[in-house]
């Protein structure tokens, strides 16, 4: 059986569809036996996303919370099929972990070809660590 040691795709109350504080999430992660937790709130392209300044300020968070490594990141929105994201690379480069995802609020659905070209463009961005959904 594979043991999960971290969850790096989580949202705090900053992403308004989520309901937990950072402390609540860390407590749950400890109960699950995790060694790390990632905070990856939605970028500003989502209706409930954080403003860009939220991600700028993440360096002010501790690197550890309650014995867990705190991975500071973002789930950015893919804005077009050329790989444009809703946060600038100057902000992304300050983060530990960046997920890039398609969300219907940030981009209209299109063909499989268009979406594939978008994914291929996104993976060329050195500040993106993970493809989301």
At which residue positions do the language-model features occur?
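N-terminal pre-domain/capping segments
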Residues: 8, 12-27, 56
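Non-catalytic positions within long, well-ordered alpha-helices that form the structural scaffold/packing
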Residues: 30-33, 123-124
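Short, well-structured secondary-structure segments
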Residues: 35-39, 71
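Catalytic phosphate/metal-binding cores of nucleic-acid and nucleotide-processing enzymes, i.e., regions
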Residues: 2
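Short secondary-structure boundary/capping segments within folded domains
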Residues: 28-29, 62
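Histidine-centered catalytic micro-motifs
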Residues: 5-15, 39-42, 131-132
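Extended substrate/RNA-proximal surfaces in nucleic-acid metabolism proteins
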Residues: 43, 48-133
């Amino acid at each position: 059986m594979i043991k999960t040691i971290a969850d790096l795709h989580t949202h705090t109350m900053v992403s308004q569809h989520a309901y937990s504080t950072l402390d609540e999430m860390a407590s749950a992660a400890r109960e699950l036996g995790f060694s790390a937790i990632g905070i990856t709130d939605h970028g500003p392209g989502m209706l409930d996303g954080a403003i860009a300044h939220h991600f700028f300020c993440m360096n002010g968070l501790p690197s550890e919370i309650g014995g867990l490594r705190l991975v500071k990141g973002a789930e950015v929105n893919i804005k077009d099929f050329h790989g444009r994201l809703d946060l600038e690379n100057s902000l992304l480069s300050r983060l530990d972990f960046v997920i890039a995802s398609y969300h219907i609020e940030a981009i209209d659905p299109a063909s499989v070809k268009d979406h594939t070209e978008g994914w291929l463009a996104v993976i060329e961005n050195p500040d993106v660590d993970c493809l989301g959904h």
